[in-house]
Every structure is written in C-alpha cells, then in structure tokens.
C-alpha cells in the first residue's frame, strides 16, 4: 500500500530505540523463556487493531523468530479485561477508565500505548422516544455493559443530573445485545458503543440523548504486567506495529474505514462516521494528559462503590499509566 511508504525509516528507528529505552526497565529483573506465541486482541472499537490484523505486519515481524500470532476478538472492554486477567491474552484493548477499574480491583495490567482518543459512547434513545433529558431516565430501563466505558459513562452522566445508579433500572447486556434490546423496545435507552452506536444513528434514526466527549476515556492498549516484565522487547515490537497501523490509518482513512466496515459488518457510512468524526489518533503516548483524565474520572468508581473502600485511585492511576515510554519518545 502506498501509505506505508509514509512511515520513514528514521521514525521507525527512533521508535525502536525509544521503546527499548522506555520498556527496558520493566524487564530488568525478570528472566523468561523465549516467547512461544504472541497473544493479543482486536476490536471493532479499535480500528488500528483491524488494520494491523488485516495486513499481517505482526505475523511478518514474528515469523523470523518462529513465533505465531494469535488474535482474539474482544466484544468490549469487559471481555478484553477478562482475557487479560485469565492469562488467555497478553495484550488487550480497553477504555482507560475500564482499565483503571480493573487494575484497582486486582487485574495486574499496565498501559504503555494509547490507541485512540475516541468519542465512542453516548446515551442513545429511539428516534420517537419521549425521553428528552437525563432527568427523564429516572425509573427507566437502560442497557449498558458493566465494566466498560459506556457503563461508566452512564453513571457519570446520571451524576450530572443528580441521579445515581439506583435511580434507573440497569439492564446488563453486552453491547450488541443492548442495541438489539433498544431496537426491540425492551429498554428505554442504551449506553452505546461505536460502531454499533453509529449504526443505530444512521440505520435506525436513533437519537443521541446525551453526549460528552470528556466522559469518553482513551483507548488503552494494556499489557499483563508479568508479560511486560518478561518480554519488553516483544512488547516494543507490538507497539511499533501499532504505530505503523496508526500512521497508515491517518494517511488512508477511507481505506481504513473500508476495513472497519468489512470486519464489523457495518456500512461504509457508519465506519466513516466512527473513524473520521469520532476517533482521534493524534496522541499515542501515555502522558500527564492521560493521568489527569483518569484522575478526573475516577471519583465515580468510589461514589458508586465499584472499588473497595480506601483504595488510593491516584496511586492506581500511576501504576496503570506507563508514561516512561511516551516521555522517551518525546525526547527522541
């Protein structure tokens, strides 16, 4: 593809060197057997993961070491976090606040890369719904997937209207099932996730009841802490491949949308809405920006008793967000 040529040799050399420096410390105290399989996820809410998988760049890189690449589809942050915690994948894609919740509750993950800054969730109602405001959700059935950004977005949104989780009837459904329930009239509202949310808008005329970009947390590429310590060089190579996919997507947005359309089985218009208008790929390096965003979002976890009392969430944010890599890249 012609867009790949945009990735200059100098950039890749800087990336490799910076990542090595940024992650070397993680493996300084760990000795591990050679990697036998690279296990990671892909997700429709992470378009660059679809690009990376489609072009086989990881397979190409690891083939010389005789290491196969195993891809697992994550239907939501909750699934990716389950896979990470169960040691069935080593690298997984989630929302930032969902990753923080998981880390606070004992899932040993770290985040050395940010795959997007999205507006991937909002509160959705049918086009003819009488619901006009957040206050109207009181006593209503609202579908949302627990342990994901849409669920946490719902809780934060309710809080702005003086409501809490107990003021609605939460219906815990996986994202696709939540949309199906909304279309069938089984719930009054749904805390959506792209590309399903974009499909609801364009294909069903659904209305976004409440949007708040700042309540959408970043797309975090999480690594099991043990794996990061034992295989920092391999993590470096995965991040370098993600960077290649990010650069290609920025240069070939329509082509990337076609890949998203084919993989997620949505129309090209839906994929373009998600990728062009609601996905920011400009800042992949974990930094103070991401730390501050999670610190601002974290109080909802304690307000709704989603973490144990007394958990120091600022400390957990520091344990999760691995800013060493980003700081090194910025100096390169």
Show which residues each predicted segment covers.
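Conserved C-terminal helix/tail region of periplasmic/extracytoplasmic solute-binding proteins
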Residues: 301-332
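N-terminal secretory signal peptides
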Residues: 1-7, 11, 15-22
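Secondary-structure end/capping motifs
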Residues: 231-307
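Sec/Tat-exported extracytoplasmic proteins
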Residues: 62, 88, 93, 103, ...
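N-terminal signal peptide c-region/cleavage motif recognized by signal peptidases
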Residues: 25-27
